[in-house]
A protein has these predicted regions:
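Acidic/His- and Gly-rich active-site-bordering loop/insert found
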Residues: 2-100
Length: 100
């Protein structure tokens, strides 16, 4: 199982790195992360997730759900993709979404 997971991540390395770099190159402050949201949600949609934007009344928030059959465990993940004013992504938030 572990090796399968590593192979799956490795197969996406170029795409995920490019996504993180794109978000890094276009830092957006909190509640203004339209570019980052689009990058992340486009990837998730293409990967078979059902994506809902504007979650919780926050225009740049989103919720993505992947269904794999009925029942079973549920896993929740959270990522931040906002930048710091005058510092950009010194916080590393540009990597959270692609890493998850």
């Amino acid at each position: 199982m572990k090796e399968h997971l590593f192979q799956a991540v490795e197969a996406q390395r170029t795409t995920l790195t490019a996504m993180a770099d794109s978000i890094f190159d276009d830092p957006e402050l909190g509640f203004q992360e339209f570019h980052a949201q689009k990058k992340l949600t486009d990837y998730l949609t293409q990967s078979g997730f059902q994506v809902e934007t504007g979650t919780g009344g926050v225009e740049t928030a989103f919720r993505a759900e992947f269904r794999n059959g009925q029942g079973g465990p549920r896993i929740g993940l959270l990522c931040e993709y906002d930048a710091l004013e005058d510092l950009g992504h010194a916080c590393g938030h540009h990597m959270q979404g692609p890493a998850i």
